[in-house]
Amino acid sequence: MYLRPDEVARVLEKVGFTVDVVTQKAYGYRRGENYVYVNREARMGRTALVIHPTLKERSSTLAEPASDIKTCDHYQQFPLYLAGERHEHYGIPHGFSSRVALERYLNGLFGEAS
């Protein structure tokens, strides 16, 4: 079982991310230059954390993504996905089964909070 979106949000806040935007579909979180989204539609949590596409390669050494991409018009801080029928913003979705695993991933990807 994966962490629910609200649980992912709590871990992000614990490691120093702050809420930037709240929409019907997503929470946007910022820490310095780093930006992530919590997919509020991920009821089972498999795609609850969405990272910027430029982090895909570095992230792959830390965790397997849930799928190649996740598109959503609410991910305004991320680039547009132009290959689809509708041009929406996109990121790389991940799911985590424990808070410890998510914290380890975030610290590996973004470094420890200062």
From Swiss-Prot:
It comes from the Bacteria. SUPFAM superfamilies: YgaC/TfoX-N like. Coiled coil: none annotated. InterPro entries: DUF2002. This is Uncharacterized protein YgaC.
